[in-house]
Swiss-Prot record:
It comes from Streptococcus gordonii (strain Challis / ATCC 35105 / BCRC 15272 / CH1 / DL1 / V288). Synthesizes alpha-1,4-glucan chains using ADP-glucose. It comes from the Bacteria. Keywords: Glycogen biosynthesis, Glycosyltransferase, Transferase. This is Glycogen synthase.
Length: 476
């Protein structure tokens, strides 16, 4: 089967979050199952800096963006059996970052138009065209409406994956003519219109042959007003083509037996290396080196979505316990300042690292006893799976992908891979936090059993890619 991905970012070339991880891992895994896979990405300046001497220049053409003709340079690099095609236009993509510009609408309108026209020029007409998030959500519409006259495109099936419904791509209706070069018929009849704006995500949901999200629970949640971001009505209407598939993680990278970023390796049968990593991490961040104290790790953006309003609200209560907390992340300045203040007030209990460091993140995943992730909503989440891979038990809000991947501890059966709370409140977060500390302190045997269960869970992309393969096959 020929499968083509189109996305705004993809590891190792460009990455700001989970979308980049998916594009870096899923195509590679699909190749192992015998599929022919291509990926189209923007050619950013950070891509040029890392891979500029490895990519191959193929050709260039021009694409109409409204009344203008814009340059499209095409580059290619084959990595892990996947053909990566890059769309090069320095005006749009050499900005020093991936998102956040005033003209993001124009940038990604250009990218989508160029990607659709590129398929024919590289002679890669896929059986399935898989697009991701709002940045590429207009592509199913373009294939079926603007470019329907291209005979080779008529049998292409399209899949849209929603990684985060909060970001929908809402723009003035004038964009249809001024950038996409199409008429207003589908806006006038309401197909593309939402809240008197052009809504790219709505277009993708309606025009794609299948819509997936990154966990089964999130697929159900976004059909409700609480999580639907005002598109729940549309998602209920299209629920027959909505599927949730949990993301995987790259188990070759996140492997406690071989991880090059760790000083001490370990496995589920011998966790002594994990304890050595704990001591090394405590020493590195300036906390007292103690084996007996529960070490709680946090690696996250510091935002309300990630639940840090609750964490800051309860942090004083947390620090009254015999516990150590290591935080790594940046985000809302108010949360950064709060953690910095508590770090100064409790230097023996809290290490607040307001930055991002890949090596330190890996050490926190591997050395902590508990990983705190109380997200308000979480489409999938990767950190909890990474933590479990290293025998670190997650404490999560029971929502989205966190619900699907973390089995809460059952005191009667001893089953469980972490701890969870259902009611999103400071009281229940603190209650669950204390329960986790109590189990760590008073029942080492149960704790070790949970660590083993967590490390045995299969979060590899092999499982997820088989589910996607079945989904693609069902469309043909």
């Amino acid at each position: 089967m020929k499968i083509l991905f189109v996305a705004a970012e993809g590891a190792p070339f460009s990455k700001t979050g989970g979308l980049g991880d998916v594009i870096g891992a899923l195509p590679k895994s699909l190749v192992k199952h015998g599929h022919q896979v291509g990926v189209i990405l923007p050619y950013y300046d950070m891509t040029d800096a890392k891979f500029g001497d490895q990519v191959e220049d193929l050709f260039y053409f021009e694409v109409s963006v409204g009344w203008r003709r814009q340059y499209v340079g095409v580059k290619r690099l084959v990595l892990n059996g996947v053909s990566f095609y890059f769309i090069d236009n320095q005006h749009y993509f050499f900005r020093g970052h991936v998102y956040g510009d005033f003209d993001d609408g124009e940038r990604f309108a250009y990218f989508q138009l160029a990607a659709v026209e590129l398929m024919e020029r590289i002679d890669f007409i896929p059986d399935v065209l898989h697009v991701h998030d709002y940045h590429t959500a207009m592509i199913p519409f373009l294939v079926k409406e603007k470019y329907h006259w291209i005979q080779a495109y008529r049998n292409i099936k399209t899949v849209l994956t929603i990684h985060n419904l909060e970001f929908q791509g809402q723009f003035p209706d004038s964009m249809l003519w001024e950038l996409f070069g199409v008429g207003y018929e589908r806006y006038a009849d309401g197909t593309l219109r939402w809240n008197d704006c052009l809504n790219w995500m709505k277009a993708g949901i309606l025009y794609a042959d299948r819509v997936t999200t990154v966990s089964p629970s999130y697929a159900g949640e976004i059909r409700t007003p609480e999580f639907g971001c005002n598109l729940d009505q549309i998602l209920r209407m299209e629920s027959g083509k909505l599927v949730g598939i949990v993301n995987g993680i790259d188990t070759e990278i996140y492997n406690p037996e071989t991880d090059p970023l760790l000083a001490h390796h370990f496995d589920k049968s011998d966790l002594s290396g994990k304890l050595e990593n704990k001591r090394a991490l405590q020493e590195r961040v300036g906390l007292p080196v103690r084996d007996d104290v529960p070490l709680v790790g946090i690696v996250s953006r510091l935002t309300r979505q990630k639940g840090f309003d609750l964490v800051v609200e309860e942090l004083h209560n947390f620090l009254q316990q015999d516990v150590q907390i290591i935080l790594l992340g940046t985000g809302d300045p108010a949360f950064e300042q709060a953690f910095a203040w508590f770090g100064q007030a409790y230097p023996d209990k809290l290490s607040a690292n307001i930055l991002f460091d890949v090596g330190l993140a890996q050490e926190i995943y591997a050395a902590s006893d508990i990983f705190l992730m109380p997200s308000r909503f979480e489409p999938c989440g990767l950190s909890q799976m990474m933590a479990m891979r290293y025998g670190t038990l997650p404490l999560v809000h029971e929502v989205g992908g966190l619900r699907d991947t973390v089995e809460p501890y059952n005191v009667y059966t001893g089953q469980g891979t972490g701890f969870s709370f259902n009611n999103f409140s400071g009281y229940w977060l603190s209650w669950t936090f204390k329960e986790a500390l109590n189990l760590y302190t008073h029942d080492k045997e149960a704790w070790k059993s949970m660590q083993e269960q967590a490390m045995e869970r299969d979060f590899s992309w092999d499982t997820a890619s088989l589910a996607y393969s079945d989904l693609y096959q069902s469309l043909l």
